Amino acid sequence: MSEFSQTVPELVAWARKNDFSISLPVDRLSFLLAVATLNGERLDGEMSEGELVDAFRHVSDAFEQTSETIGVRANNAINDMVRQRLLNRFTSEQAEGNAIYRLTPLGIGITDYYIRQREFSTLRLSMQLSIVAGELKRAADAAEEGGDEFHWHRNVYAPLKYSVAEIFDSIDLTQRLMDEQQQQVKDDIAQLLNKDWRAAISSCELLLSETSGTLRELQDTLEAAGDKLQANLLRIQDATMTHDDLHFVDRLVFDLQSKLDRIISWGQQSIDLWIGYDRHVHKFIRTAIDMDKNRVFAQRLRQSVQTYFDEPWALTYANADRLLDMRDEEMALRDEEVTGELPEDLEYEEFNEIREQLAAIIEEQLAVYKTRQVPLDLGLVVREYLAQYPRARHFDVARIVIDQAVRLGVAQADFTGLPAKWQPINDYGAKVQAHVIDKY
């Protein structure tokens, strides 16, 4: 094998030579997780064979397996894990038959995947990024100082390879676990909606909001530190440009830059995809609510009919007369239904025709003010016109006068921003607020 990387044929030959194989049914995997959990409580990280048998007994009881063959099955499970290099067995001549067991790196890696890594923590991610930032800064300072090959290997390459790269891999693994959690949340939401969507709405909202918040915390933490990390990587890259013999450092820096870009970009893309799924679920719930209105009524009615003899009920219904909208513009007033037929000299004349005639008369009379350039006091003019008409027509006449007056010109006092005084326009309390029109 080479120092920095292995080819596919080399890896295949290595796995074949060492006879690597893993087979973990659900009961064996549960046993391994139980061992890892109990092992975490030991200060020395060691477990005796009796403790492993006790852990196996808990797993066997959980799977409702027979207790008569606990000893034999526990011994087989322990030997199988030792053979698969998940446990290391240590024996001594002084304590024959009382072996000591420790989890192997493979066993720790598998249990970490199922236990520790599934617990997302913003604080943990912040600490990892803080450590990475410190390592990168020290490596960048060492790169700018320069030195011999040993200096570059010890102070630049080693921190990047064995500290920064491993933490990047850990963050990448966290993101991949988040991908699995998102898929699990989607499956849970689908099951909830298939059972009873009305009762599942609150649970779905909780799952959606928790996942969205976790993704956003992860991305915010990464983006906050991303620029500083990239800046230090660029410092190292600039320092290696004048050294032809530092291609191994330059290649490692390029790999780290690509990995950091991939981590940040995938975090944002994951948020965008989750937002789309969130909208899809809410749209489905809204559609289901709209479609279920009549279904709920029909279900309740059907249930009431089925339980009528046990719980009798009476149905009361109302059939009210239809309400007519008298303000409908499309309705034509039929005079013969109200007043009967009228003589020709009392024929009804629509108000629209009267309004047009009145507007023409008022427009002609008000035009004198524009021709003579005389200020038009709208309050006095409206009062004079209203005095000529009955009270029932005051509102319509006042509106016509004001409409025609504002077409003639404007009041310069309007541009001062000061409000005009209220002026009475009839003897019944009506008032108008308008400045004198003096610019035509």
From Swiss-Prot:
GO BP term, pick one: cell division
Keywords: Calcium, Cell cycle, Cell division, Chromosome partition, Cytoplasm, DNA condensation
Principal location listed in the UniProt entry: cytoplasm
GO molecular function, one term: calcium ion binding
Cellular compartment(s): Cytoplasm, Nucleoid
GO cellular component, one term: cytoplasm
Keyword flag Calcium: yes
Region spans: Leucine-zipper: 208-236
Matching HAMAP family: MukF (MF_01803)
Subunit structure: Interacts, and probably forms a ternary complex, with MukE and MukB via its C-terminal region. The complex formation is stimulated by calcium or magnesium. It is required for an interaction between MukE and MukB.
Homology family: Belongs to the MukF family.
Function: Involved in chromosome condensation, segregation and cell cycle progression. May participate in facilitating chromosome segregation by condensation DNA from both sides of a centrally located replisome during cell division. Not required for mini-F plasmid partitioning. Probably acts via its interaction with MukB and MukE. Overexpression results in anucleate cells. It has a calcium binding activity.
The protein, known as: Chromosome partition protein MukF
Taxon lineage: Bacteria, Pseudomonadati, Pseudomonadota, Gammaproteobacteria, Enterobacterales
UniProt gene name: mukF
